[in-house]
């Protein structure tokens, strides 16, 4: 089981417009302590949009 203090936890990225959770990735907590935001393709919207880390 993954620890809550894991250095590279799994996170879910959700589209900012339609709120669909499209991507699962890992992030390094030491390098990115804040919420991650990436520009990814949203298959629901059909365009590239900002995806933020959801909790």
Swiss-Prot record:
Disulfide bonds: none
Species of provenance: Mycobacterium sp. (strain JLS)
GO molecular function, a single term: structural constituent of ribosome
Gene Ontology biological process terms in this record: translation
UniProt keyword annotations, A-Z: Ribonucleoprotein, Ribosomal protein
Family in the record: Belongs to the bacterial ribosomal protein bL33 family.
Superkingdom of origin organism: Bacteria
Name this polypeptide is given: Large ribosomal subunit protein bL33A
Gene3D superfamilies: Ribosomal protein L33
């Amino acid at each position: 089981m993954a620890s809550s203090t894991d250095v590279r936890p799994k996170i879910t990225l959700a589209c900012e417009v339609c709120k669909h959770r499209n991507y699962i990735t890992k992030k390094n907590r030491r390098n990115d302590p804040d919420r991650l935001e990436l520009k990814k393709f949203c298959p629901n919207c059909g365009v590239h949009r900002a995806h933020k880390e959801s909790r």
